[in-house]
Amino acid sequence: MSVNMDELKHQVMINQFVLTAGCAADQAKQLLQAAHWQFETALSTFFQETNIPYSHHHQMMCTPANTPATPPNFPDALTMFSRLKASESFHGGGGSSSPMATSATSPPPHFPHATGSFATPSWPTAASPPGGPQQHQPQPPLWTPAPPSPTSDWPPLAPQQATSEPRAHPAMEAER
């Protein structure tokens, strides 16, 4: 009875291999037998052999379809990428967009005095949220509204900070 069970297991593996690799059943059986019925080994062998020229899948594998990984016209795409220059785009509009670019890329240097008093308490909350999620939840909402427009948001947030953390309010007022 174990022979029939082994045959059944082998037939199931062959069918699964055909569905996974998209090959013929006789090729799947040969690969699985060569790999001593180890599915992953046979599958790896199949996909490594598709690069060998005698494989009947070779033409289909080497001529990719127009997928997101292959652009429609590769030389034109290379030409467009070669024309892009990141340094010129940042320095070209540097007069009006450089403060916004620096605040978007690195907010702490843009607000060094306002973040100086909160640098120590805010980093541990980001590093260890599971430790005390109820204690650390009030701090991120106070931190996120500040960077967009500090002059208009700080006075409405100052009374909220005074009620939640009395020592945070004087530090923010002193830095302002």
From Swiss-Prot:
Coiled coil feature spans: none
Composition skew (Pro residues), residue ranges: 138-150
One Pfam family named in its UniProt record: UBA_8
Bias type Low complexity, positions: 120-137
Top-rank taxon: Eukaryota
Biased composition (Basic and acidic residues): 166-176
Residue ranges of the region described as Disordered: 87-176
Stated family: Belongs to the UBALD family.
Protein's recorded name: UBA-like domain-containing protein 1
Annotated organism of origin: Mus musculus (Mouse)
Gene name of this polypeptide: Ubald1
